[in-house]
Amino acid sequence: MRFFIIIVLVLFSTNSFAHHPGHKVEVAAPFPSVNLEIMKDSVDGYNLYIDLKNFNLAPDLVGKENQSNTGYLSLYVNGIKIARVYSQWFHIPQRFFYLKENLVKVTLNTNLNGEFTLDGETIQSVLIVINN
């Protein structure tokens, strides 16, 4: 029984179920980019602004055939996928910021849940939020 518990803890601690580790798709020119800005919310958590260039958010196409530089965003906090994002603003509740240093990451995803890449590297933006 102890062996089983250790395996379960390892699986959950590596976050095996948080995203689709499937296919990667090279982007086409003009190459998309993503940058993040985060601001403390006056009530709870943080407001995230996602600055996108050359990328179309298309929630109506998710699950359909891939199109160049079109899809959705995946939002991760501390390695855990917390949402699909379909706009440039997103509110993240404080409960996700439980560490002293919290890693926020956004990736560009295809309609069929793959990750867009440039020269084999996932197109993403990462920032660290420090809890005081």
What does each model-found stretch correspond to?
Residues 13-15:
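N-terminal signal peptide c-region/cleavage motif recognized by signal peptidases
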Residues 19-41:
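Short, compositionally biased P/S/T/A/G/V-rich stretches that sit at domain boundaries
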Residues 40-54:
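Contiguous beta-strand segments within globular domains
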Residues 46-50, 98-111:
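Short, well-structured beta-strand segments within conserved domains
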Residues 51-65:
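Short amphipathic, basic-aromatic surface patches that mediate peripheral association
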Residues 75-80:
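Short strand-turn-strand beta-turns centered on an Asx-Gly dipeptide
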Residues 81-87:
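Short beta-strand segments within Ig-like beta-sandwich modules, predominantly Fibronectin type-III
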Residues 83, 109-118:
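Short acidic/polar inter-strand loop motif in beta-rich domains
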